[in-house]
Structures are given as C-alpha cells and as structure tokens.
Amino acid sequence: LHLGGKVINVNSQESSVQKGETFNDTLKTMEAYCDGLIIRSPNNEILSDYQNNIDIKMINGGDKFEHPTQALLDLFTIRQELGTVNNLKIAIVGDLYHSRTIISLVKMLLNYNVALYFVFEEENKMDLPIYLQKYLIEIKEKSYNTNHIIEYHYEYDLDKVIPIVDVIYMTRSQKERHMPNNDNLLHKNKLIRL
C-alpha cells in the first residue's frame, strides 16, 4: 500500500460463485481488475489447478496444508532481528504435525545454511508429517555435493535446546485441525510451554 497499491477484498460469500459462476470465471474477472491475487482457500490445490489459466501472479495466502505468507513474515522477522538467516540454529517447537506455518517455514529455511531442531513431546506424537520428513531427507541428499549445509534434529526436551539455539519458533496446539477423539487432545495440558 505504501507503494501505491490498492486492495480489492473478495469474500467467497459475496462473489458470483454463489450464483453459479465458476471459480475460473471469477479469476478471469479478477485478472481484469488487478496485477496479482493473494488467495486464501481450504483447497490446497487451487493455485496449481488455476495458475496456468490466468496471466497475473497468484500468491498462496494459506491453504489446507501450508501458510507461505505467514512463513515469509516469520522469515522476514528473523532476518530483521538477527541480520541474517544463514548459519542460525532454529528450534521449531509445538504441534509440528498440524501446523501449516511450520511446513512453509521449513521449506523456506532449507534455502539457507541452518540447523533445525524440531521439538515436540514424544508421547503426543506431534512430530513432522511424513511427507515433510521425506522432503527433508531428499533436500539433504541433494545438498551433499554443494556448500549448502542442512542439519536437522528431533528433540523431546526443550530445555536441552534453549541454550544452543538462536531462534525459538513456537506454535500453538492446532486443536481445530485435530481429529475428534484424537489422543493428542488428551495431552493438550502437557504440550511444551516456555
């Protein structure tokens, strides 16, 4: 907005989608009004499904599995406060399994030389989703023949990690994303707290 931009906020309840217009037609209409779109949707495939149908940029403002705009702000804050992201030791703590921001932040952090410490309570089984664990392994294997250093650790005791990290990234329990009758809810009072 400081650069002269203007925002057009379109709520799905206020759009012509309610009258039967296709989402693709809505995007085509928006394309005529603006230079870019930030889309927040519970559909995690919406950008990949439609990005080739319009000639303006689309930014993921949050979907079912990721929240890259929040992760960009978090990355910006780390850099703003510490002057760099490279060579930092970063603890990522809490409900790792259900957090959308963690997935996006980890993917961004893997572009830097960082050591990541994933801290979660073992009995809660809230560690990283399997696909993110596989992604970490894949990226680490690709970096073996480069100067890109990727280091990550799993830890159950935050007290062990606090003295050695530069950043502690805390997430809350994502109880709205838990399945009903999930054992994790039984442990909500035992989640890691600072």
Pin down the residues of each PLM region.
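Glycine-rich phosphate/diphosphate-binding loop of Rossmann-like nucleotide-binding domains
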Residues: 1, 80-171
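Phosphate/diphosphate ligand-binding glycine-rich loop within oxidoreductases
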Residues: 1-79
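Short gly/ser/thr-rich secondary-structure transition/capping motifs
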Residues: 20, 75, 147-155, 189-191
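Glycine-rich, N-terminal phosphate-binding loop of Rossmann-like dinucleotide-binding domains
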Residues: 41, 171-172
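Short amphipathic alpha-helical segments
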Residues: 49-52, 103-106, 180-183
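A short helix->loop->beta-strand "cap" motif at the edges of active sites that frequently abuts
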Residues: 56, 113-114, 194
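Glycine/threonine-rich flexible loop motifs
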Residues: 172-193
